[in-house]
Amino acid sequence: RPVAEAVATAKAVAEAVGVPLALVGPGDPQADAEVAQAVAPVLTGRRSLLGLATEENYRAVGAAALGYGHGVIASSPIDVNLAKQLNVLLTRLGLDEANLAMDPTTGALGYGLEYSYSVFERTRLAALFQNDQKMQLPIVATVGAEAWKAKESRAGEDDMPGMGDT
């Protein structure tokens, strides 16, 4: 879908709910950056979270957030060190840690929730026992995004009898 449609949708939702939003693009780093850059000025003053910022697009997403007073969802593969590295890069860009949330990727399938949870635990241990400021951030767990990638989530009653209408 066009970026203009994402902007119009974000504006309509923001006006309807009146609270800060967490806005993510379609999952492609370049497209996510384009959406963040287009949506950020429209939502000035609402302190929304823009994302997903990755190693490939953190400069563009971070600059959009910094320029218009938003926060960033920093997304990294399921790895504590990569999550910390991205947090460091975003703070060096000028974002305050208070405006960051981490998405260390949640594997509803594949790696599984257990492995994802163990990464969350190690992140919290680093934050608490090592007093690591870059890891003392809120965690965003996007479990649903991974679950919807499964073929069963898109199958209808005809494709998978007994599963119900999905």
Could you describe each region identified by the protein language model?
Residues E56-T166:
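Catalytic alpha/beta core domains of metabolic enzymes, predominantly
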